[in-house]
Amino acid sequence: MKHTRLFHCASDEEIKKGETTDVYFARTKQVLQAKNLDKLRVVAEVTSGKLPRGWPWGILCGIEEEARLFEGCPVDVYSMPEGSVFYYTDSQGVREPVMFIEGSYGEFCVLETPLLGLICQASGVATRAARVKKAAGEKLVMAFGIRRMHPALSPMLDRAAYIGGLDGVSSLSGAKAAGAKPMGTMPHALIIALGQGQVDQVKAWKAFDEVMPPEVPRVALVDTYFDEKIESIMATEALKDRLYGVRLDTPGSRKGNFPELVREVRWELDVRGYKHVKIFVSGGLDEEKVRVLSEAGADAFGVGTSVSNAPTIDFAMDIIELEGKLVAKRGKLGGKKQVWRCPKCMVDSVLPFGSPQPSCPECGGKTQPMLKPFIKKGKIVAKLPKPVEIRRYVLKQLKRLSIEGS
Protein backbone atom coordinates (compact mmCIF):
# COMPACT_ATOMS: atom_id res chain seq x y z
CA MET A 1 0.00 0.00 0.00
CA LYS A 2 1.41 3.34 -1.02
CA HIS A 3 1.72 5.92 1.74
CA THR A 4 -0.02 9.18 0.89
CA ARG A 5 1.26 11.08 3.92
CA LEU A 6 4.23 10.91 6.25
CA PHE A 7 2.37 11.25 9.54
CA HIS A 8 -1.00 10.06 10.79
CA CYS A 9 -2.69 13.46 10.79
CA ALA A 10 -5.90 14.62 9.14
CA SER A 11 -5.59 17.46 6.66
CA ASP A 12 -7.48 20.75 6.95
CA GLU A 13 -9.69 19.67 4.06
CA GLU A 14 -10.52 16.32 5.65
CA ILE A 15 -11.53 18.01 8.90
CA LYS A 16 -13.66 20.62 7.12
CA LYS A 17 -15.42 17.93 5.06
CA GLY A 18 -16.31 15.96 8.18
CA GLU A 19 -14.03 13.01 7.42
CA THR A 20 -12.84 12.93 11.03
CA THR A 21 -16.38 12.43 12.32
CA ASP A 22 -17.81 9.37 14.02
CA VAL A 23 -19.46 7.03 11.54
CA TYR A 24 -22.87 7.31 13.17
CA PHE A 25 -23.04 11.00 12.23
CA ALA A 26 -22.25 10.12 8.61
CA ARG A 27 -25.03 7.52 8.71
CA THR A 28 -27.36 10.04 10.36
CA LYS A 29 -26.80 12.45 7.48
CA GLN A 30 -27.42 9.65 4.99
CA VAL A 31 -30.73 8.73 6.65
CA LEU A 32 -31.86 12.37 6.87
CA GLN A 33 -31.13 12.93 3.19
CA ALA A 34 -32.91 9.72 2.18
CA LYS A 35 -36.02 10.85 4.09
CA ASN A 36 -35.77 14.46 2.87
CA LEU A 37 -35.29 15.67 6.44
CA ASP A 38 -31.77 17.04 6.16
CA LYS A 39 -33.14 20.59 6.01
CA LEU A 40 -34.75 20.36 9.46
CA ARG A 41 -33.80 23.53 11.30
CA VAL A 42 -32.36 22.91 14.75
CA VAL A 43 -30.58 24.67 17.56
CA ALA A 44 -27.80 22.63 19.14
CA GLU A 45 -25.95 23.77 22.26
CA VAL A 46 -22.57 22.80 23.68
CA THR A 47 -22.32 22.25 27.43
CA SER A 48 -19.71 20.58 29.61
CA GLY A 49 -20.06 17.68 31.96
CA LYS A 50 -18.66 17.98 35.45
CA LEU A 51 -15.19 19.45 35.25
CA PRO A 52 -12.16 17.21 35.86
CA ARG A 53 -10.96 16.60 39.41
CA GLY A 54 -13.50 18.94 40.94
CA TRP A 55 -12.14 22.03 39.19
CA PRO A 56 -14.51 24.93 39.90
CA TRP A 57 -14.17 26.56 36.47
CA GLY A 58 -12.69 26.09 33.03
CA ILE A 59 -11.12 28.26 30.33
CA LEU A 60 -12.74 28.03 26.89
CA CYS A 61 -10.15 27.51 24.16
CA GLY A 62 -10.12 26.42 20.52
CA ILE A 63 -12.67 28.97 19.36
CA GLU A 64 -10.53 30.36 16.54
CA GLU A 65 -10.28 26.86 15.06
CA GLU A 66 -14.03 26.50 15.60
CA ALA A 67 -14.48 29.58 13.43
CA ARG A 68 -12.41 28.00 10.65
CA LEU A 69 -14.41 24.78 10.95
CA PHE A 70 -17.79 26.47 10.45
CA GLU A 71 -16.66 29.17 8.03
CA GLY A 72 -18.54 28.57 4.79
CA CYS A 73 -21.14 26.34 6.45
CA PRO A 74 -24.58 28.04 6.24
CA VAL A 75 -25.25 28.18 9.98
CA ASP A 76 -25.37 30.77 12.75
CA VAL A 77 -23.11 30.31 15.78
CA TYR A 78 -23.21 32.12 19.10
CA SER A 79 -20.26 31.55 21.41
CA MET A 80 -18.49 32.78 24.49
CA PRO A 81 -15.30 34.60 23.46
CA GLU A 82 -12.14 32.51 23.45
CA GLY A 83 -10.47 32.61 26.85
CA SER A 84 -13.74 33.01 28.75
CA VAL A 85 -14.19 31.37 32.10
CA PHE A 86 -17.08 28.90 32.08
CA TYR A 87 -18.76 26.76 34.71
CA TYR A 88 -20.43 23.36 34.68
CA THR A 89 -23.62 25.00 35.98
CA ASP A 90 -24.78 28.50 36.79
CA SER A 91 -25.62 29.85 40.26
CA GLN A 92 -28.95 27.97 40.20
CA GLY A 93 -27.58 24.64 39.00
CA VAL A 94 -28.54 25.04 35.32
CA ARG A 95 -26.03 23.61 32.85
CA GLU A 96 -24.14 26.40 31.16
CA PRO A 97 -23.85 26.49 27.34
CA VAL A 98 -20.59 27.83 25.92
CA MET A 99 -22.03 28.04 22.40
CA PHE A 100 -25.01 27.15 20.26
CA ILE A 101 -25.41 26.47 16.54
CA GLU A 102 -28.54 27.18 14.54
CA GLY A 103 -29.20 25.87 11.05
CA SER A 104 -30.21 22.89 8.95
CA TYR A 105 -28.99 19.83 10.83
CA GLY A 106 -27.90 18.08 7.66
CA GLU A 107 -25.45 20.92 7.03
CA PHE A 108 -23.46 20.43 10.22
CA CYS A 109 -24.23 17.07 11.82
CA VAL A 110 -20.95 15.55 10.59
CA LEU A 111 -19.01 18.43 12.17
CA GLU A 112 -20.02 17.56 15.73
CA THR A 113 -17.04 15.27 16.32
CA PRO A 114 -14.37 17.73 15.14
CA LEU A 115 -16.25 20.59 16.85
CA LEU A 116 -15.96 18.86 20.21
CA GLY A 117 -12.42 17.69 19.57
CA LEU A 118 -11.24 21.22 18.83
CA ILE A 119 -12.45 22.60 22.16
CA CYS A 120 -12.33 19.63 24.56
CA GLN A 121 -8.56 19.18 24.52
CA ALA A 122 -7.57 22.82 24.04
CA SER A 123 -9.85 23.92 26.88
CA GLY A 124 -8.39 21.27 29.16
CA VAL A 125 -4.86 22.49 28.42
CA ALA A 126 -5.81 26.15 28.84
CA THR A 127 -7.60 25.42 32.11
CA ARG A 128 -4.67 23.51 33.60
CA ALA A 129 -2.30 26.25 32.45
CA ALA A 130 -4.49 28.87 34.12
CA ARG A 131 -4.51 26.90 37.37
CA VAL A 132 -0.72 26.59 37.31
CA LYS A 133 -0.30 30.29 36.57
CA LYS A 134 -2.70 31.18 39.38
CA ALA A 135 -0.59 29.09 41.75
CA ALA A 136 2.65 30.74 40.55
CA GLY A 137 1.34 34.30 40.83
CA GLU A 138 3.68 36.80 39.22
CA LYS A 139 6.49 34.25 38.80
CA LEU A 140 7.50 32.99 35.35
CA VAL A 141 5.94 29.76 34.07
CA MET A 142 6.93 28.10 30.79
CA ALA A 143 5.29 25.24 28.88
CA PHE A 144 7.74 22.37 28.41
CA GLY A 145 5.35 19.51 27.63
CA ILE A 146 5.17 19.08 23.86
CA ARG A 147 7.71 16.24 23.76
CA ARG A 148 5.13 13.99 25.43
CA MET A 149 2.52 14.55 22.71
CA HIS A 150 2.18 14.01 18.95
CA PRO A 151 4.29 16.70 17.23
CA ALA A 152 1.42 17.70 14.95
CA LEU A 153 -0.34 18.98 18.08
CA SER A 154 2.50 21.20 19.30
CA PRO A 155 1.10 24.47 17.87
CA MET A 156 -2.33 23.85 19.41
CA LEU A 157 -0.94 22.70 22.76
CA ASP A 158 1.47 25.59 23.18
CA ARG A 159 -1.10 28.13 21.98
CA ALA A 160 -3.62 26.83 24.52
CA ALA A 161 -1.02 26.86 27.30
CA TYR A 162 -0.07 30.43 26.46
CA ILE A 163 -3.70 31.55 26.28
CA GLY A 164 -4.26 29.92 29.66
CA GLY A 165 -1.72 32.28 31.16
CA LEU A 166 1.70 30.65 30.89
CA ASP A 167 4.42 33.18 30.14
CA GLY A 168 6.21 31.28 27.40
CA VAL A 169 6.30 28.07 25.37
CA SER A 170 9.20 25.92 24.27
CA SER A 171 8.39 24.82 20.73
CA LEU A 172 9.21 26.79 17.61
CA SER A 173 5.85 26.07 15.97
CA GLY A 174 3.97 26.61 19.23
CA ALA A 175 5.57 29.99 19.76
CA LYS A 176 4.60 30.98 16.22
CA ALA A 177 0.99 29.93 16.85
CA ALA A 178 0.98 31.87 20.12
CA GLY A 179 2.59 34.93 18.58
CA ALA A 180 5.40 34.74 21.12
CA LYS A 181 9.12 34.02 21.22
CA PRO A 182 10.11 30.45 22.14
CA MET A 183 11.60 30.09 25.60
CA GLY A 184 13.87 27.44 27.08
CA THR A 185 17.15 26.71 28.80
CA MET A 186 19.54 23.89 27.82
CA PRO A 187 19.30 20.09 27.76
CA HIS A 188 21.48 17.56 29.56
CA ALA A 189 22.53 16.37 26.09
CA LEU A 190 24.38 19.64 25.45
CA ILE A 191 26.37 19.31 28.65
CA ILE A 192 27.25 15.68 27.96
CA ALA A 193 28.16 16.34 24.31
CA LEU A 194 30.33 19.38 25.07
CA GLY A 195 32.19 17.38 27.69
CA GLN A 196 33.38 14.98 24.97
CA GLY A 197 33.62 12.11 27.40
CA GLN A 198 34.79 14.22 30.33
CA VAL A 199 32.79 15.48 33.29
CA ASP A 200 33.00 19.15 32.36
CA GLN A 201 29.77 21.08 32.85
CA VAL A 202 31.61 24.41 32.81
CA LYS A 203 32.67 23.88 29.21
CA ALA A 204 29.04 23.59 28.12
CA TRP A 205 27.86 26.58 30.15
CA LYS A 206 30.61 28.76 28.71
CA ALA A 207 30.00 27.53 25.16
CA PHE A 208 26.32 28.40 25.49
CA ASP A 209 27.27 31.86 26.73
CA GLU A 210 29.70 32.36 23.85
CA VAL A 211 27.35 31.23 21.08
CA MET A 212 23.91 32.47 22.10
CA PRO A 213 22.90 36.07 21.29
CA PRO A 214 22.68 38.51 24.22
CA GLU A 215 18.88 38.45 24.38
CA VAL A 216 18.85 34.74 25.30
CA PRO A 217 18.95 34.41 29.11
CA ARG A 218 21.85 32.34 30.44
CA VAL A 219 20.14 29.64 32.49
CA ALA A 220 22.50 26.82 33.43
CA LEU A 221 21.21 23.29 33.92
CA VAL A 222 22.78 22.18 37.20
CA ASP A 223 21.99 18.54 37.90
CA THR A 224 23.82 16.56 35.23
CA TYR A 225 26.65 14.97 37.22
CA PHE A 226 26.95 16.48 40.69
CA ASP A 227 24.73 17.68 43.49
CA GLU A 228 22.50 20.58 42.41
CA LYS A 229 23.95 22.83 45.07
CA ILE A 230 27.52 22.16 43.93
CA GLU A 231 26.74 22.66 40.24
CA SER A 232 24.84 25.88 41.00
CA ILE A 233 27.92 27.29 42.70
CA MET A 234 30.10 26.12 39.79
CA ALA A 235 27.81 27.82 37.27
CA THR A 236 27.74 31.14 39.11
CA GLU A 237 31.52 31.15 39.50
CA ALA A 238 31.93 30.34 35.79
CA LEU A 239 29.55 32.95 34.35
CA LYS A 240 29.38 35.50 37.19
CA ASP A 241 27.01 38.37 36.42
CA ARG A 242 26.18 36.96 32.98
CA LEU A 243 24.31 34.07 34.59
CA TYR A 244 20.58 34.75 34.72
CA GLY A 245 19.53 31.56 36.46
CA VAL A 246 20.09 27.91 37.28
CA ARG A 247 17.63 25.14 36.45
CA LEU A 248 16.99 22.16 38.67
CA ASP A 249 15.52 19.29 36.68
CA THR A 250 16.23 16.53 39.16
CA PRO A 251 14.89 13.05 38.24
CA GLY A 252 11.92 11.99 40.35
CA SER A 253 13.89 9.07 41.81
CA ARG A 254 16.42 11.52 43.32
CA LYS A 255 14.28 14.48 44.27
CA GLY A 256 13.86 13.69 47.95
CA ASN A 257 12.67 16.91 49.52
CA PHE A 258 12.61 19.17 46.49
CA PRO A 259 11.49 22.31 48.37
CA GLU A 260 14.36 21.86 50.81
CA LEU A 261 16.78 21.48 47.90
CA VAL A 262 15.53 24.79 46.48
CA ARG A 263 16.07 26.45 49.86
CA GLU A 264 19.62 25.09 50.04
CA VAL A 265 20.51 26.34 46.56
CA ARG A 266 19.01 29.75 47.29
CA TRP A 267 21.04 30.03 50.51
CA GLU A 268 24.32 29.04 48.88
CA LEU A 269 23.85 31.51 46.02
CA ASP A 270 22.82 34.36 48.32
CA VAL A 271 25.71 34.01 50.77
CA ARG A 272 28.14 34.16 47.83
CA GLY A 273 26.62 37.38 46.56
CA TYR A 274 24.62 35.88 43.71
CA LYS A 275 21.19 37.06 44.78
CA HIS A 276 20.45 38.05 41.18
CA VAL A 277 20.58 34.43 40.00
CA LYS A 278 17.08 32.98 39.56
CA ILE A 279 16.15 29.41 40.43
CA PHE A 280 14.22 27.60 37.70
CA VAL A 281 12.63 24.24 38.52
CA SER A 282 11.10 21.62 36.23
CA GLY A 283 10.13 17.97 36.20
CA GLY A 284 6.72 16.58 37.13
CA LEU A 285 5.23 19.90 38.21
CA ASP A 286 1.55 20.71 38.64
CA GLU A 287 -0.28 23.56 40.37
CA GLU A 288 0.20 22.18 43.88
CA LYS A 289 3.92 21.51 43.43
CA VAL A 290 4.37 24.95 41.88
CA ARG A 291 2.74 26.52 44.94
CA VAL A 292 4.98 24.62 47.37
CA LEU A 293 8.18 25.26 45.39
CA SER A 294 7.30 28.93 45.00
CA GLU A 295 7.01 29.24 48.76
CA ALA A 296 10.42 27.54 49.06
CA GLY A 297 12.04 30.20 46.89
CA ALA A 298 11.81 28.99 43.29
CA ASP A 299 11.60 31.91 40.84
CA ALA A 300 10.43 30.22 37.64
CA PHE A 301 8.86 26.96 36.53
CA GLY A 302 8.95 24.69 33.50
CA VAL A 303 5.71 22.72 33.47
CA GLY A 304 5.37 19.74 31.17
CA THR A 305 2.97 16.83 30.98
CA SER A 306 0.50 18.12 33.56
CA VAL A 307 -0.38 20.86 31.06
CA SER A 308 0.21 19.24 27.66
CA ASN A 309 -1.63 16.08 28.76
CA ALA A 310 -4.20 17.90 30.88
CA PRO A 311 -7.58 16.22 31.44
CA THR A 312 -9.93 17.05 28.59
CA ILE A 313 -13.13 18.97 29.21
CA ASP A 314 -16.13 16.71 28.61
CA PHE A 315 -18.11 18.95 26.25
CA ALA A 316 -21.18 17.56 24.51
CA MET A 317 -23.52 18.91 21.83
CA ASP A 318 -27.28 18.40 22.08
CA ILE A 319 -30.25 19.47 19.98
CA ILE A 320 -32.49 21.73 22.09
CA GLU A 321 -34.85 23.15 19.45
CA LEU A 322 -36.36 21.52 16.37
CA GLU A 323 -38.26 23.68 13.86
CA GLY A 324 -38.89 26.25 16.59
CA LYS A 325 -40.16 23.71 19.14
CA LEU A 326 -38.38 23.09 22.43
CA VAL A 327 -36.88 19.60 22.58
CA ALA A 328 -34.19 17.92 24.65
CA LYS A 329 -32.97 14.47 25.50
CA ARG A 330 -33.23 13.21 29.06
CA GLY A 331 -31.05 15.20 31.46
CA LYS A 332 -30.85 18.29 29.23
CA LEU A 333 -33.02 21.43 29.11
CA GLY A 334 -34.84 22.46 25.94
CA GLY A 335 -34.66 25.85 24.31
CA LYS A 336 -32.04 28.35 23.23
CA LYS A 337 -30.37 30.05 26.20
CA GLN A 338 -28.22 33.02 27.14
CA VAL A 339 -25.57 33.10 29.86
CA TRP A 340 -25.57 36.34 31.87
CA ARG A 341 -22.46 37.11 33.91
CA CYS A 342 -21.69 39.62 36.62
CA PRO A 343 -18.18 40.86 35.74
CA LYS A 344 -17.60 41.85 39.36
CA CYS A 345 -18.65 38.62 41.08
CA MET A 346 -18.02 36.24 38.14
CA VAL A 347 -21.44 34.71 38.91
CA ASP A 348 -23.56 33.38 36.02
CA SER A 349 -27.28 33.08 35.39
CA VAL A 350 -28.63 30.96 32.51
CA LEU A 351 -32.00 32.10 31.15
CA PRO A 352 -34.10 31.42 28.03
CA PHE A 353 -32.75 33.38 25.07
CA GLY A 354 -34.49 36.73 24.77
CA SER A 355 -35.25 37.02 28.50
CA PRO A 356 -34.77 40.46 30.10
CA GLN A 357 -31.30 41.22 31.43
CA PRO A 358 -31.14 39.93 35.02
CA SER A 359 -29.33 41.48 37.98
CA CYS A 360 -26.49 39.66 39.66
CA PRO A 361 -27.95 37.27 42.26
CA GLU A 362 -25.12 38.14 44.65
CA CYS A 363 -24.40 41.88 44.38
CA GLY A 364 -27.44 43.08 42.46
CA GLY A 365 -25.22 44.65 39.81
CA LYS A 366 -25.52 44.61 36.04
CA THR A 367 -24.81 41.44 34.11
CA GLN A 368 -23.44 40.95 30.61
CA PRO A 369 -24.44 38.43 27.91
CA MET A 370 -21.68 35.89 27.31
CA LEU A 371 -23.00 34.16 24.17
CA LYS A 372 -22.36 36.56 21.30
CA PRO A 373 -22.78 36.36 17.51
CA PHE A 374 -19.81 34.49 16.12
CA ILE A 375 -20.84 33.25 12.69
CA LYS A 376 -23.79 34.41 10.57
CA LYS A 377 -24.77 32.30 7.56
CA GLY A 378 -21.28 30.86 7.38
CA LYS A 379 -19.43 34.17 7.69
CA ILE A 380 -17.26 35.01 10.68
CA VAL A 381 -18.71 38.18 12.21
CA ALA A 382 -16.81 38.26 15.50
CA LYS A 383 -13.31 39.58 15.99
CA LEU A 384 -10.71 36.83 16.34
CA PRO A 385 -8.29 38.34 18.86
CA LYS A 386 -4.58 37.57 18.94
CA PRO A 387 -3.36 35.04 21.51
CA VAL A 388 -1.70 37.78 23.56
CA GLU A 389 -5.05 39.58 23.84
CA ILE A 390 -6.83 36.37 24.85
CA ARG A 391 -4.15 35.66 27.44
CA ARG A 392 -4.59 39.16 28.87
CA TYR A 393 -8.34 38.50 29.12
CA VAL A 394 -7.72 35.22 30.94
CA LEU A 395 -5.33 36.80 33.45
CA LYS A 396 -7.84 39.56 34.16
CA GLN A 397 -10.51 36.97 34.99
CA LEU A 398 -8.10 34.94 37.13
CA LYS A 399 -7.76 37.85 39.55
CA ARG A 400 -11.34 37.17 40.65
CA LEU A 401 -11.07 33.39 40.85
CA SER A 402 -9.64 30.74 43.14
CA ILE A 403 -8.35 27.32 42.08
CA GLU A 404 -9.88 25.82 45.20
CA GLY A 405 -13.42 24.55 45.57
CA SER A 406 -15.75 22.53 43.40
Where are the regions that the model predicts?
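Glycine-rich phosphate/ribose-binding loops and adjacent secondary-structure elements
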Residues: 189-354
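Ordered alpha/beta subdomains of enzyme catalytic regions
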Residues: 1-216, 242, 316-406
